[in-house]
Structure formats: C-alpha cells, structure tokens
C-alpha cells in the first residue's frame, strides 16, 4: 500500500509531517466524489503567502477528518488527475469511508493544534497556555505550609502594631513628679475633735435639774451658772489668807508680764482667773461660801 502512495508523487513525507496537512480543512465526503485534486495547487511558503490567496486555497482544498476510534495506522488516500485510472483500486476504501460518513452531516471543525507560524510569537504563548499554567491558574487551594506562613506573618504584624501603640501611649502620658515630703520639726499631736452637739449634751447634763432641754435655754442657764461659780471663787479667794497670798503673788507676776502691754495695769483677781481659763469646782465645796441670805436648795428645785 505504501508503495502505491509513493508512486503518486503527491503524498510525500513532508506532506504527512506538516501540522496543516491533515487538519487544514474539513469537508464531508460524497458517495461519488472521494478523491482530492491537488494537481493545480502549488504549496508555497506560509510566510510569503498572501491572506487572500491563502483563504482561496484553504476553501478549495478538502481533507477528511478521521474518527477518533480509527487506528493510528489508518491513512487517507489522495489521487491526482493523472492517476484517475487507479480509482478502481480504491473502491474498497471508498465503500468503507461511505459507511463512516453521512452526506447529511454538517461540517465538523476539528480542534486544530497550535500552528507553527504562531510559535515564533511570544504573544500567542499566553493565548495557548500549557497544561502546567492551567493547573496553576485553577488551583485555588494553597498548601498548608503556605497558609501557616501567612498566619504567622499576620500574627507577627499584629503584635508589632500593638507594641507600637503601647509605646505611643506610654510616651504620651506625662511623668508624675515625686512627692517630696518635708519632715516637720513639731511632733504630731492628735487633736480631739468635739462636735457642738456633744458639748450641748454635756451642758444639758449639767443643768438638767432645771428641766430645760432646748438649746437656747440650756446655754443661757449654763452661762449664768458659770458666772455664779466665778463669783464664788473670787469671794473664797478674798476671804482665805492662804489663797490670798497665793493670789497676790500670781497677781504680781501677771502685772509684771502685762506691764509691757497697752492695757489697763490695774488688774483684779477676777481678770486673772479669766486669763487662765474656767475651772469647775464641785458643788459641795461651795456650800460654805455663799452668803447666808441665799438659799442654795432653791437652785435645784
């Protein structure tokens, strides 16, 4: 069979090896027309071929698309006008091809491989991506190592941002000055804080036999009682010789101290007691001092 194809002069090795030889054009076979005429077609270089002539020749040529289930050793037989007498030899092949193809079928466009002309341009490398690029594009699932690396980078970035924010906050806060406490030369005394209500209750207990509980009356009676005590003390000091000598000595000391002042220099013992403060005495010691015309029992009734 191969020898018969060599004698035709058309089916050479270069024609079978080209990428466009078998799939350059597709046409359905007919029951009465199987042979392809290549007698008037001249193969030219595709680089110098004009687009118009290329399209005309492309439409004029017709080849057969073999079925995918055919064996790789199946071949297409081509004859020229000079070898018409050999048509009878190929009746068996024609009958076989008639059973494969139907005249009512439409034109099928094969998946043509990438032409050799486009391989010289880098632009068409992106148009016809290879299998490795398609896998890399559609492979959306990243490996676990890449995911862990991304997570570690994000955590490190967040930690650095938080540390920077803390440093900014610390730098913005003003420094507190240390509190300097000067040691006092005087010892700390605990001052007893007494409320005014506590003092009033004490005065109420003092003048409670009179039966008065309001604040104004209690204060008035307390003042009168204090004046009475002062008068009793002055009278007792004046009548007692021992107390008189002590009072006279104290009066002299007080007069010496007050001589530098602008106040009156003739001070009485009553003023001396006021300067020292009020000293309360028990009631039992005052019974002998009051005058006889004063009845002390009437004070407590």
UniProtKB/Swiss-Prot annotation:
Keywords: DNA-binding, Nucleus, Transcription, Transcription regulation. Gene3D superfamilies: Helix-loop-helix DNA-binding domain. GO terms for cellular component: nucleus. Changing residue 266 to D: In strain: cv. C24. Residues 29-106 form the KRAB domain. Changing residue 299 to F: In strain: cv. C24. SMART domains: HLH. This is Transcription factor bHLH103. It comes from Arabidopsis thaliana.
């Amino acid at each position: 069979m191969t020898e018969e194809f060599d004698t035709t002069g058309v089916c050479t090795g270069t024609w079978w090896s080209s990428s466009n030889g078998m799939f350059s054009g597709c046409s359905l076979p007919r029951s009465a027309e199987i042979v392809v005429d290549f007698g008037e077609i001249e193969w030219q270089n595709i680089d110098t071929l004009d687009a118009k002539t290329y399209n005309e020749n492309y439409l004029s040529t017709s080849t057969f698309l073999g079925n995918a289930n055919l064996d790789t050793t199946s071949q297409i037989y081509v004859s020229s006008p000079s070898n018409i007498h050999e048509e009878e030899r190929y009746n068996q092949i024609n009958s076989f091809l008639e059973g494969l193809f139907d005249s009512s079928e439409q034109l099928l466009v094969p998946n043509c491989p990438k032409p050799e002309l486009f391989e010289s341009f880098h632009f068409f490398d992106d148009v016809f991506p290879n299998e490795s690029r398609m896998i890399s594009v559609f492979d959306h699932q990243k490996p676990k190592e890449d995911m862990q690396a991304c997570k570690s980078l994000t955590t490190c970035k967040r930690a650095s941002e938080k540390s920077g924010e803390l440093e900014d906050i610390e730098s913005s806060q003003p420094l507190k000055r240390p509190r300097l406490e000067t040691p006092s030369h005087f010892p700390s005394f605990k001052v007893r804080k007494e409320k005014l209500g506590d003092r009033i209750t004490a005065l109420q207990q003092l003048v409670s036999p009179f039966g008065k509980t309001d604040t104004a009356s209690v204060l008035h009676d307390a003042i009168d009682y204090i004046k009475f005590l002062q008068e009793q003390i002055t009278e007792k000091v004046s009548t007692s010789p021992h107390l008189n000598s002590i009072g006279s000595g104290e009066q002299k000391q007080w007069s010496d101290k007050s001589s530098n002042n602008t106040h009156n220099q003739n001070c009485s013992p009553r003023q001396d007691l006021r300067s020292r403060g009020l000293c309360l005495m028990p009631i039992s010691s005052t019974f002998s001092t009051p005058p006889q015309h004063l009845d002390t029992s009437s004070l407590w009734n």
